[in-house]
C-alpha cells in the first residue's frame, strides 16, 4: 500500500509506504522525476493531479508542461506523455477505462484584450507594452477588457481511453477557471 503525493514546487512525486508492518511505514520510499540527461532540465514540471488506470499505470498532470505523464507503477518511470491542448491541466481522474482531464484555464473563447495576439485582430491595446515594456513602475489597478472571439478555443474536458492513451473526446462550455473534479 502506497500514497503518491505530487510535489508541485520540487517537480516530483513522492511515494510513501503505508504498510504498518514494514520498517519504512510512513517514509518516502521512492521519488518519481523525469530529468533530461543532456540538458539536466526537468520534463516533470509542476505535477498536480494523480490518477491510476490500474495497479500498473498512473497518470500525473504536469501543469506547466500542458501534458499528462504516463508512469509505470512498478519501475516508477515516465514511459510517455499525453499532450493536452489547453493551459495548465490539473484535475484528473480515471473511471470506467477513461482518463478525464480538466485544465485550470480553458479560455471559453475569451482573451484579455491586453494579451498577446492570436490572429492580429483580437487585441484592443497591448497591455504588455503599456504596463511592462514601457513603464518602469508597476501599473496598480491596471484594467483590461475581455474580448470574445470564435477562434479562441474553448476546451474544458479531455477524455482519453486508458488502454490506448488516445484522446477520444473533448468537451467544451464547462467554465473558464476549472479547479477540480
Where are these regions (language model features)?
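Beta-propeller blade signature
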Residues: 76, 122-123, 147-162
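Beta-rich, blade/repeat-based domains predominating
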Residues: 1, 35-53, 85-95, 174-181
